[in-house]
Amino acid sequence: MVVLAASFIVAAPSPAGAYSYGDPDKEDVAETYKLIEAELAENDWDAALAAYQVRRAEIESHFGKDVALTLDANFRDKNKALVLQNYRYILYMNLDRRFTYAEQNINNYAQASLLLAKAKGTFDVLKPYLEIRIPNQIQEIRDHFDKAYESLGNPGLFNLGKKPVDVEAYRRHTSAILTTLKPLFAYTPA
């Protein structure tokens, strides 16, 4: 009886396990790009479209109805090059969005660092594409991410190790990332 009760307690779902905030440096929109790219490499348009449709409402909400309609048309036309090109442009816009929201929350260390981690997750998904186009600048971009993160300061623990926020440094480093990447991302509306 004791064994049965103990096994029930172990097998019972824990309230702590009911909530999952995911990996802080993973960006769902970017992770979906990887799925779409892999499915299109196999010419599995149904699976690629299904992956896109999971994120479509989010894409429309963050990047506009026209962007979502463009991707809808790219999928309908089965234009692999435009699906990937326009989705990569969404990821570039997502970097900008995350940088902007991190700056707006720059005095909230936890929130700003989470948003910057999401931006870094987007960059990591784009890295294979970027390594072909700008291999000599990847480390420079990583350095800018590190310095942008450092510019968020550090609230310290009981004021030990506390460092102030440097908004200008944050802007300088995130702007350098966006400026370097912008020429590599084109958008072709439907």
Q: Predicted segment positions?
A:
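Bacterial N-terminal signal peptides
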Residues: 2-11
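Bacterial Sec-dependent signal peptides at the C-terminal "C-region" and cleavage site
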Residues: 11-17
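Mature extracytoplasmic or organellar-lumen-exposed domains after removal of signal/transit peptides
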Residues: 17-190
